Amino acid sequence: MVASVGRRSKQAAPQMNGGFFMLKGISPIISPELLKIIAEMGHGDELVLADANFPGTSIGQKCVRCDGHGCAEVMRALLTLFPLDDFVEAPLAVMQVPAGMFPGDKAPIWEAFRAAADTDLPTAKFDMMAHDAFMERAKKAFAVVQTGETALYGNIIIRKGVVRA
């Protein structure tokens, strides 16, 4: 006869935003797969945070899905775990919008990107890239995070900085 030693009650695991989490201090938006990807990244590596229309799987060397969350929301969560690169003038890059599409030729979502960047590096500047140049840079990125973002021109490339002790 075998005794049942160390059995735990069949209590449900804690939930947040509909998903299970087993680590403290890490947003449940960050999946285990995404956590592994950002842990593997080094200084200067880039990550594409892509909207729902972006061809993430065909463009990216690696593509991880983050459906149900917007790009700025994912960006805020990521920037609690790694810094933006402060060794370059513009550690952020967005795709230029066609002239006249938005007031001031700025996609409204860029304000949310700015607010997210300000949580880590308020002096961070954005590169404004032509569509084709952005796509070529995205192909070289460490990975693409495909979000559920529905805002037009809701893509951003973020460059990882150095974690200082």
Regions found by a protein language model. Give the residues of each.
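Conserved mixed alpha/beta catalytic, RNA-binding, or beta-rich assembly cores of soluble enzyme
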Residues: 45, 49-53, 60-77, 81, ...
